Amino acid sequence: MRQALPLVTRQGDRIAIVSGLRTPFARQATAFHGIPAVDLGKMVVGELLARSEIPADAIEQLVFGQVVQMPEAPNIAREIVLGTGMNVHTDAYSVSRACATSFQAVANVAESLMAGTIRAGIAGGADSSSVLPIGVSKALARVLVDVNKARTTRQRLTLFSRLRLRDLLPVPPAVAEYSTGLRMGDTAEQMAKTYGITREQQDALAHRSHQRAAQAWAEGKLAEEVMTTYVPPYKNPFAEDNNIRGASTLADYAKLRPAFDRKHGSVTAANSTPLTDGAAAVILMTESRAKELGLRPLGYLRSYAFTAIDVWQDMLLGPAWSTPLALERAGLTMADLTLFDMHEAFAAQTLANLQLLGSERFACEVLGRAQATGEVDDAKFNVLGGSIAYGHPFAATGARMITQTLHELRRRGGGFGLVTACAAGGLGAAMVLEAE
């Protein structure tokens, strides 16, 4: 094992995560229908600051992410600062790393803390699959630019006459890789076939996720980390995730048809995460700054790692690549972990990564390591359910996982937790957290 890389400031302070919060997650076109991501971000950051009772001017930086970008608000982070009563001089910028976006936001704030340029910051992300940047065809886009430069009505009419009826149809954003054209579900199907993952195994994992999430809500474990929201017309509160199927049975999952490979596939809507709306954020500080403000941290950021692989085949293997690197940088092994939380983009992707984490062959031949990262103990894995149940507002999922894992570590008396995710573009992210 290589030498650990401690995440500390120049003064030796650890990176403390003092609090975290999220909105409830809503299935596309339900409770948050019509609410843009920037407004979801304002909701969660405003409430996070109010609950923490931290002076607004104590926050020196806000790094926020959004995957489905809206042209009218390209820097969501700055709009959140301006819309929540924070000090207008607060530094704010936006990041995007697909499904690992809020992991990146946390890493960026942590790096600012370690560099000594700030002592406290907020990191998070928000996405709306209900408010989308609906575009136009390339042909229409070109004509519109030319029309804007045309000087006469005749020139404008001539330009429009070149268009066909199909050129006028709206173009929704593609949920596919730009470089390959493959949808995420196509990659999940690849992985199911490559690693011999059956439909029954996928359905069982999805069912487990929903059962664990429903139990977490029933036992009140999520109440402290999920805010109650009110949206126009402000008549009814929205306080709990609305995707969780607590009363479902395995037989219900078996009824669904494959969603991507219609003839020979095993990936369905039920064993995949749904399109979702929501936001999540965390407050990070140096350990000494938290003490000055009289705050008891939820926990500490021990290490993080980002990786990238090719996108043509089985590209959602980010956790299998980033997990050993994050553990190595933390000076830990899989056996040292109290909790292991993996983003469930698809059941097939999750099961493939779990399989490879325990594979000596993958470790030696692909990663160039002497031994496998280690089998993940089922008693430590996604103990409160995962993204298949909660949903996946792309940029918010990492902050949800971090907050959820730290609260659960505290309930268990402390320890180490690892959170990890795959992301579009063949990217992977992992973070090791510590609670006392």
Curated annotation (Swiss-Prot):
Top-level taxon of origin: Bacteria
Subcellular localization(s) per the UniProt record: Cytoplasm
Entry GO MF terms: acetyl-CoA C-acyltransferase activity
Entry-linked SUPFAM superfamilies: Thiolase-like
Residues at the catalytic site: C99, H392, C422
TM ranges: none
Statement: the UniProt record of this protein carries the keyword Endoplasmic reticulum: no
Pathway assignment: Lipid metabolism; fatty acid beta-oxidation
Classification via Gene3D superfamilies: 3.40.47.10
E.C. no: 2.3.1.16
Reactions that this protein is recorded to catalyse: an acyl-CoA + acetyl-CoA = a 3-oxoacyl-CoA + CoA
Quaternary context: Heterotetramer of two alpha chains (FadJ) and two beta chains (FadI).
Matches recorded under PANTHER family: ACETYL-COA ACETYLTRANSFERASE, CYTOSOLIC (PTHR18919:SF107), ACETYL-COA C-ACYLTRANSFERASE (PTHR18919)
Assigned protein family: Belongs to the thiolase-like superfamily. Thiolase family.
Protein purpose: Catalyzes the final step of fatty acid oxidation in which acetyl-CoA is released and the CoA ester of a fatty acid two carbons shorter is formed.
Protein name per its UniProtKB record: 3-ketoacyl-CoA thiolase
